[in-house]
Amino acid sequence: VTMPITGPVARNWADTDIITRTQRLGLNVSTTTNTAQIRQTIVYFSRNTSFDLLTGFNMAENATDTAIRFFIGISANIVFTNVEPNTLLNCVGICRLSTSNNLHIVYNDNTGIGTTIDLGSNFPANTISTDKYLLKIKAVSTGIYIKLERVGTAFSYETTLTSDIPSTSTGLNFGAYIVDTSGPNTTTGFDWYGSYIMTNN
């Protein structure tokens, strides 16, 4: 599956802290309203085929800014633009809304505004290269299971989503994006740790 990346930047390894010890790829963008993103050009799994996704990330450049939009997870998108993550259709993932400093779970079916769960101050989205997150999204018989872990802490959140989610036959893929929605041009980014997706076709 082709995976175009917009705004890649190398991150150096160093035995300094939980972030620098992680093999990771930075994605950033220096122009306001433009997106840095990683995406897949086709959809290739669904709830019917079953899927099990594991990925990881941390917020990086300009995370203290108050107008950032961020999403990482599964969706039917093959390209991302400067939109609030809760307007994405057929998605399940983790996001930062431009109105919040916390991470949220976001999910939506093929219509309307998505549902969000504010994970609160124990899951900050406005820290720069300090908080490491692991994300698991999995199709289960009753819906879609999602778990976010803040590595090195006691904080994790997990739930099974049963409504306002993609249908069993909707084609999906993996993707992530970040955008600074307003203000002067400032480099804004996140780090991606790679993804593992297992499907049972």
Pin down the residues of each PLM region.
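Ligand-recognition surfaces built from glycine- and aromatic
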Residues: D164-N201
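Short, aromatic/His-centered strand-loop micro-motif at the edge of beta-sheets
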Residues: N108-L134
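Short beta-strand segments enriched in hydrophobic/aromatic residues
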Residues: F57-M59, I74, A139, R150, ...
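Solvent-exposed strand-loop boundary residues in beta-sheet-rich modules
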Residues: A76-I78, D109-T111, R150-A154
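Short, solvent-exposed beta-strand-to-loop segments that form ligand-recognition rims
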Residues: E149-L172
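Secretory/extracellular carbohydrate-interaction modules
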Residues: L25-L103
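Localized edge beta-strand/strand-to-loop motifs within extracellular or lumenal beta-rich domains
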Residues: D131-Y145
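Extracellular glycan-recognition surfaces and repeat-rich motifs
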Residues: V1-Q23
